[in-house]
Each structure stands twice: as C-alpha cells, then as structure tokens.
Design a protein with these regions (language model features):
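N-terminal pre-catalytic "stem/leader" segment of glycosyltransferase-like enzymes
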Residues: 362-591, 881, 900-918
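C-terminal amphipathic helix plus adjacent low-complexity
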Residues: 510-522, 836-920
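A donor-sugar binding/catalytic signature common to diverse glycosyltransferases
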Residues: 601, 606, 621-624, 777-822
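Conserved catalytic-core segment of nucleotide-activated headgroup transferases in glycan assembly
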Residues: 252-253, 259, 533-547, 677-765, ...
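Nucleotide-sugar donor-binding/catalytic module of glycosyltransferases
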Residues: 1-238, 695, 800, 882
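A nucleotide-sugar donor-handling region in carbohydrate enzymes
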Residues: 505-513, 620, 626, 632-724, ...
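Active-site and donor-binding regions of nucleotide-sugar-utilizing enzymes
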Residues: 367, 404-406, 523-682
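Catalytic binding pocket for nucleotide-activated donors in carbohydrate/polymer assembly enzymes
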Residues: 668, 764-769, 796-871
Length: 920
C-alpha cells in the first residue's frame, strides 16, 4: 500500500453522479475501495441525481461505513449539474468522474498517481476503456493505447479523448471550469476539449483499465442517444459547432485534432439510424446540420479515420463535394488511390470478399460470401483459378448487405458464389483474383461465419474426402488422410494454446475421440429445441411426435434451460438436456440435425465468440421449424448468409413463395410446405375444449424499445425507458379503458393481456384490474382454445387463432413506426389478407369489440374464406409431414389434403358403392 503526503486532504476525488443505478452501484464503489493505492487516499462524492430506485439506500450505507465518502442529494437535474455540484466538495489533487454503472481496474489509480508525479505539467491522464457485460471489447479508439506515453495533440491529432469518466484531471486545471448543463450528450467532449484547446498535452496509460458497462438492457446514456431527439440537432450546435467556433476564435483556424474529432463524429452521424426516429422536418434539419459540419472539415481528416469502412468515408466526401468520389479513384501499383491518399492495397486487403459459407458436397466446392468492395462495379469483376482453370462467380442480391445511412443506401448488398469441381485424389489449390480496370491482381479473401474456419492461421476443415486449409491468400484442398488431419489438428491446438484456449483444446480432443470411435455408427442424433427458456412450441410438439413414433436409427434429444418452468414440466420424458450445460454442446457437436423453432444464435453456438474455434465441428443440418408463420419481410434476419438453414418449415403457399422468390437466398430444396407441428395438437384439442367468454390481448414486441432481452442470460431485462414508450402507454391505457371494461362487464367477458417473452420483465409497469389480468406466459394452447376473441397487432399468433377459425381484431396504432423500426411489410397485407378487421385507434377497436361480443364472437364468412385459402393444410398431420420431409420423403409436399371426419368418409364411401351398384 502506498501512503502519500500532500497538502490536499486526499490524493483523488472521485465524483459519481447517481441516477437509478442501484443494480450496479455496489460494484462501482467497490472498485474504488479495492484500489491498490489504498482507499484512504481516495475521496468519493456520491451525488444522487433524483434517483427513484434503491440508490439512496446504497449511498447512505457507504457514507456510514467510510468517513471519506460524501453523500449529496439533489433533484433530477442531469449528469452535468450533478458533477458540477460534486466538484464543490472535491478535496483531492486529481479529479475523476466515474459513471455509477462502471468500474475501475484495481491497480488503475496506482498507475495514474505514478504518472502525475512524473509529469507535473500535465493536466489530463487518459485510461484505456474496455466494455463489459453484453460486450467484451476495447473502445473503438483503442489504437491510442499502443503504448503508455505522453501525447502532443498538435502532432498526434488522431489521439482524441472523448470520455471524462476514463480521464483524470489535475484539480487546479479545472478550477472555474464546469460541465455544460442541459446537454443530453457531448458534455464530456465539450469539457475536455476546452482544456485541450489551451494545453493540447495528455498522457495515455495502457495498463490502467476503465470498465465501461455496455448494458444488456440498453439503458445507458450513450446507448440511448438515438432515442433522444435532442442528440441529433442540439448537440451539433452546442458541441461540434461550438468547438469549431472556439478553435477559430483562439487560433484563427480549426486545429487538426478538432477537425479529426468533427470528422469522427460526422461519420458516426451519417451512419446513424436517425431517419427511423425523426419526422420529415427534423430529418431535413439534421441532414443539413451534418452537411454543414462536412463542409468545414478538410478531406484528409475523413480519410484518416481508422474505424470506419472506406465506403462510408468516400460516401461522406461525395456528399461534401457533391460528386461521386468513386469515379475519381485510380489504380497505381496495385493500390487504390484518391487525391494522392492510398485507400488500400488490393493484394493485401483482406475484406474485398468474406466467404460466409464454405462447403463440399459430391466433390463440388461451394463458396458463398459477401462482396465488400466499395469500387464501381462496372470497373471490376472476380474470378478464381484451380489447376489453371478459371471459374467465374454468380451474383445474388441480399438486402442484409445494404448499407443504410442518413443519406440513403450507399451499397446494394451483393452475394458472390462459386461452385468448383474438385479432383478426388489430387491436391487442389484455389487462387482468387480481381480484374480492376483490366489489370488482374491476386487478392486475399477472408473467412467468416459458416465457413467452418477461424481467423487463426492453422485453422482447417474436414468434409467428405477432403481437408481444406487456408495458406496465405490461397485455399488449399487435400485428399483426406488420417495422418494429415492429425498433423493439422496438432498445429491448430498449438496455436490455440498460445491464446489460452485450453478448454477449446479439451473439447476438440474429446470430439475427435468420439469421431474416431464412431466412424461406422448406424444411428443418427437429432437435437430439438424451442426458445432457450420456454418450450410449448413447434420443437416440443415435434419431439413428442417422435416419442410416439420411435423411429429406428434416430436418437433424439430436447434441450431447454434447467431453471425454466418447462424443463421441470418435461423432466418425465426421456432425453431432456439442460441447454446451459456442457452436455448440450457435446451432444450438439455429435448431432446430425439441429431442429429448432428458435433462430437465436445461442441455440446453434452456445459458447459465444469461442464458437469460431470449433466451427469445423458444426456439421449438422440446421432445420428451422419456425416459431410462427413468416408474413413480414425478414430477409435481413433469416437469409441464407445470416442463418444458413438447411430447411425451413412453411405452412402456406404464399409464405413458401415469399421465401423462394425473395432475397432470402434459399432454393426449393431448402423449403418444406408441411404446416407447423404445434397445429396437430391445436386441431385435436379444438374438439375437446369449449370456448369461454374470454378475450385475449396478445401484442408482439418492438425492436426499437431497448432492453428486450439479456444477450448473456437470454432473459427479459427491466428497462426504465420502456414505460415512456408509445407502446406501453397505448396498451396500459387500453386494458384500463373504462368503455372497454364496461362493454366486457355488460356481456360478462373476462380478459388476459399477454406479455411477449421479450417484455416479461416490464410487467411491473402495467396496471391490471378485476376484468383484464396481465400474464407472462400465454403460449399454452388451452388459452387460445378457451378464448372467444383475439386482439393483436402484428403477432403471428393470429395464424394459430385463424387455424381454429375464431374471430380476430388487429390494432395498428403505430403502423408506420412499426414498419420503420421493426419489420418491413412482406407478402401479407392485413386489409386484403387479414383474418379480421384492422383498426388504427382504440375507438375503432372498442367499437369492433362491442360488435363481436354482441354477436357472440362469430367469425364472418369473408374471414373464414381467407383462412381456408391461406393454409395449405388444416389437419393434424403436420408433424408427420415434417418428419417425412426431413428424412427426404418425396412427392407429398404440394398435394393439398383435406381432413375428413369418419362420418363424412363413411357417407362418401356409401355414395361410391351405390354408384358402382347401379353401373353394374
């Protein structure tokens, strides 16, 4: 422990603005108490900025425990005011502004103290930012920390410092300086640059780590800037333009480090999705404000940005110059040049093509990936060579690769693919080339998701009778040999050991042993799932079908988290696996098929980023049972490059065609038109369960409401700003609408408002009553069957309700916003194809509810007709068709079947017999 003697009472003063951060506050304060420099050298000033959670209790607890902790309570003014008030209590030589949900590495203050003593003329020290919780990366600008050093911004103008929380300030240098109050975003930047414009010197300490919490519920201030409309126009005026004007007033010019920062900020803003949130008037104002920044900054400061794609930088310059910069690019010595600035070297740049899918089938090498080039497409084309034979690619267009910006789409997504025949007993080598302006250059492709190869140099992939391996800018393909595979595996494990991946090595060793011992296995393994924490969907019903069928040669498992309700409900069945266990991963790697109704990444890759090191073992067919009928345009989320489904289950010819003919990238052999397995049970129970006087209100979720699901634990997360959303306000008002409740009471109806799984943690905000209750889980089919009337917005649950031919009301109070922020409209038009009336406000909805209750919730003929036209099958043979389709039974998919009762069948049989009698 270091004991320091100085005239100030403390060496450090740490000011923490606290606002509703009770969940994290213990961790933040604990990181200060545990500093190796000694907590007696640190003063903490806790400023409670009007918190409404348990933050005050935590603050008071620490104040009672430690004399060097001060607690101040103020109304909710905002972080700037809270910090300014905190500074009036500071008695330390050096000041830090720790955010109340972040924390410090335990030795950080020790390093900072050392460098402040060494450099007595320095006023700012910057520490390295590392994200934690839902991210595990260093900050975008981490290149500044290549080494611990003193930086003069007049020379290294790209080393901009944007965070006050990860900085330490000499208290004497900030006397009389304050954070600008009322600023929602950018208060740190304005505060820091006001100091640096006077003295552009600071120290970067690589070893001192500031941990920035990237919240799973997306409720931090930085994460929510897109939601607060002040960020768009207000901060351009009061932060970016302010700094430009301040620099000009001091130096008669915009100094380079301010220009570099403005270019950095402008590119972020061009790339933002503000067009989703702003009305047309504010959108135009915002674009004009961005253009104003562009016009004040020199070109080179955009080109020198390291973290942005080249295509974005060139697009920004095209806006600035009002001309297409791409047409001004030239090729010189294999380099692409603009205005004497080298953008990239074509034969060294690794991201012209990223192969997303690499596969071998029937001695054909299939490569499919993303064309990442920013070049004018009329000027170049790709080809590859194998054994001096040239092959040219096919091009497809997937919307997932569109690059949408504030000023429109700057890159039409393009997928490139090769199909190359391989010679069985020969060593093959594939070389890749680009022809640009008639000059041929060998290029260096990269390998991404579903390529079965990681970024490590000794990564390889075994498939059929071949072994694939990257060698520099080539793809080498060898005939399979046991010894060669062993050699490659040893080299790969040595490389994994160097990066401390011992667990991955153990996993690979176990799996190799399994493969060697089961070369001639006479059975298949099928892994089946629904959501990680919830069953009762197509996965469970298909699993139950297999349990009854007991197909020979197939071992099937159902996986779900062991802390879920459904895990304990299903425990009496055989082969139930905990989705969170190591067993799940081991069985998944052994599986021939992964059959799931859930498209979450965790299902197919339960170990996150480390999954890339075992991606060569992911050889199962990936079968998507669907968690509902696809009606919207989901090309961005379910396309082949993003998901790589082997098979997708569909229920309607319209749904089938929308996937086949749209930009999903799938072919007929990837699609089955069978119906959903859960419909079997729904069809059977329809005859057994009687409808009751019951209304089900069942809306879907919204992508633009942050805090939907925890990316780590896959659970719903509480979100403070959920209660301010239009979504919450509409539905909370609806379920408590006096007119609606009076109508329901008059006709003796009860109701349930069902929360989407992504919003379960938000239940606390809703207010129920004695007529409409709020429930978390409503996917029990018995609830649907007991229900007389369904009210929904865009949830595909209405297809289930239509399947059993019951009335539906749609409420589209936020239709434009939903289409803008959630999913674009697909083939299904609610007015033309819907199974019920569409309302756009609560008045229309309540009127239709009254009509339905008055008429005993009878389905109108027009909607009954639409339902029958929509579904390919209305029977209980869906699981059977899925099973047959999976095991490659043919000639049944498009034969429309009708379900006859035994009585109807008997009548038809008698009619046929009578006709035959009279004929003869």
């Amino acid at each position: 422990m270091i004991i320091i003697y100085y005239t100030n009472q403390y060496y450090f003063s740490v000011i923490i603005s606290v606002y509703n951060s009770g969940r994290y506050l213990n961790e933040s304060i604990g990181s200060l108490i545990n500093q190796t420099i000694g907590f007696e050298n640190i003063q903490i000033i806790l400023v409670n900025d009007g918190s409404t959670d348990n933050s005050e209790n935590i603050c008071l607890k620490y104040k009672e425990l430690y004399n060097n902790i001060i607690y101040v309570k103020i109304p909710h003014y905002g972080v700037s005011k809270a910090r300014n008030i905190g500074m009036t209590y500071a008695k330390g030589l050096y000041i830090n502004f720790l955010d109340s949900d972040d924390k410090w590495e335990s030795n950080a203050f020790k390093y900072v103290a050392l460098f402040f003593k060494l450099y007595k003329n320095i006023d700012i020290i910057s520490c390295r930012i590392k994200y934690f919780e839902s991210w595990n990366h260093y900050h975008f600008l981490d290149y500044k920390f290549k080494q611990t050093r003193l930086v003069n911004l007049t020379q290294e103008y790209n080393c901009i410092q944007l965070s006050a929380s990860s900085s330490f300030f000499r208290s004497s240098s900030i006397k009389g300086k304050y954070f600008t109050e009322g600023v929602f975003s950018g208060e740190d930047i304005r505060f820091i640059f006001n100091i640096l414009l006077i003295k552009p010197l600071l120290i970067f300490i690589k070893e001192a780590i500031y941990y920035y919490r990237k919240r799973s519920d997306s409720t931090s201030a930085i994460q929510n800037t897109e939601i607060n409309k002040n960020f768009y126009i207000w901060t351009i005026q009061y932060v970016q333009q302010y700094l430009i004007d301040k620099s000009i007033s001091l130096y008669k010019k915009i100094v380079p480090f301010i220009q570099f920062y403005i270019a950095y900020e402008t590119l972020f803003r061009i790339e933002s999705k503000a067009y989703k949130f702003l009305d047309s008037n504010n959108y135009i104002k915002y674009c004009n404000a961005i253009e104003s920044l562009l016009n004040q900054i020199e070109e080179k400061f955009f080109l020198e940005q390291l973290i942005f794609p080249i295509i974005l930088k060139l697009f920004a310059l095209s806006i600035k110059n009002k001309s297409d910069i791409n047409k001004q690019l030239i090729l010189r010595n294999e380099s692409i040049i603009y205005s004497n600035y080298i953008l990239l070297n074509l034969n060294k740049y690794k991201y012209l093509i990223i192969w997303r899918i690499v596969d071998i089938s029937n001695n054909i090498l299939h490569l499919e990936g993303e064309d990442k080039s920013f070049l004018s497409r009329e000027k170049y084309f790709y080809f590859c060579k194998i054994s001096n034979q040239k092959y040219y690619p096919k091009y497809n267009y997937y919307s997932v690769y569109d690059f949408m910006t504030m000023f429109g789409n700057i890159n039409e997504g393009r997928v490139i693919s090769f199909d190359i025949p391989l010679k069985k007993n020969n060593n093959n080598q594939v070389n890749f080339f680009i022809s640009y302006n008639n000059k041929i250059i060998e290029i260096f492709p990269s390998f991404g998701k579903f390529s079965h190869m990681s970024s490590l140099s000794h990564s390889y992939y075994t498939k059929e009778n071949f072994i694939l391996k990257k060698i520099n800018n080539k793809l080498a393909i060898y005939p399979y040999q046991h010894n060669l595979e062993n050699s490659f595996e040893n080299l790969y494990c040595i490389e994994l050991k160097k990066i401390n991946k011992e667990k991955i090595i153990d996993l690979r060793t176990q799996h190799f042993e399994y493969k060697r011992n089961n070369l001639n296995k006479n059975y298949k393994i099928w892994m089946i799932t629904d959501r990680p924490d919830q069953a009762q969907d197509n996965g469970e019903y298909f699993f139950r079908y297999l349990n009854k069928l007991k197909p020979k040669g197939i071992i099937f498992y159902f996986a779900i988290k062991n802390d879920s309700f459904d895990y304990h409900r299903l425990r009496n069945l055989n082969n139930i696996i905990d989705l969170n266990s190591e067993d799940y991963l081991k069985f998944l790697l052994k599986s021939d098929k992964l059959i799931t109704s859930c498209s979450e990444l965790f299902i197919k890759n339960p170990i996150g980023e480390d999954g890339k090191y075992i991606s060569d073992f992911y050889n199962f067919d990936y079968i998507y049972l669907n968690n509902g009928i696809i009606k919207d345009d989901l090309t961005k989320y379910l396309n082949k490059i993003t998901q790589k489904f082997s098979t997708i289950i569909t229920s309607s010819k319209k749904e089938y065609n929308s996937i086949l003919n749209n930009l999903y990238g799938y072919k007929e052999n990837n699609l089955l038109l069978t119906g959903l397995p859960r419909y079997d049970n729904l069809f059977r129970l329809k005859k057994l369960i009687q409808t009751e006087k019951f209304i089900l209100i069942f809306p879907t979720w919204r992508m633009n409401i942050k805090g939907t699901r925890d990316l780590v634990n896959h659970n719903s997360i509480k979100s403070e700003h959920f209660k301010n959303s239009i979504y919450f306000q509409f539905y909370n008002n609806l379920i408590n609408n006096k007119e609606l409740l009076q109508i329901m009471n008059k006709y003796e109806y009860k109701g349930i408002f069902c929360l989407h799984p992504n919003f379960i943690a938000q239940k606390r905000y809703f207010i129920d009553n004695n007529i409409i209750q709020i429930k978390e889980i409503c996917n029990n089919q018995k609830i649907l069957l007991k229900t007389s009337l369904l009210i929904t917005d865009y949830s595909s649950v209405f297809f289930d309700f239509g399947f059993i031919e019951k009335p539906i009301l749609y409420i589209h109070f936020d239709y434009d916003e939903y289409r803008r922020n959630h999913f674009p409209e697909g083939y299904f038009n609610y007015k033309k194809d819907g199974f019920g009336p569409v309302c756009y406000d609560s008045k229309c909805l309540i009127k239709n509810v009254e009509y339905q209750l008055k008429n005993k919730c009878k389905l109108k003929k027009i909607y009954s007709k639409r339902i029958k036209q929509f579904f390919r099958y209305i029977d209980d043979k869906n699981s059977m068709r899925v099973f047959k389709g999976i095991i490659k039974y043919k000639n049944y998919i498009f034969k429309k079947t009708y379900y006859f009762s035994s009585k109807i069948f008997l009548i038809l049989f008698l009619v046929v017999c009578i006709k035959i009698y009279f004929i003869f």
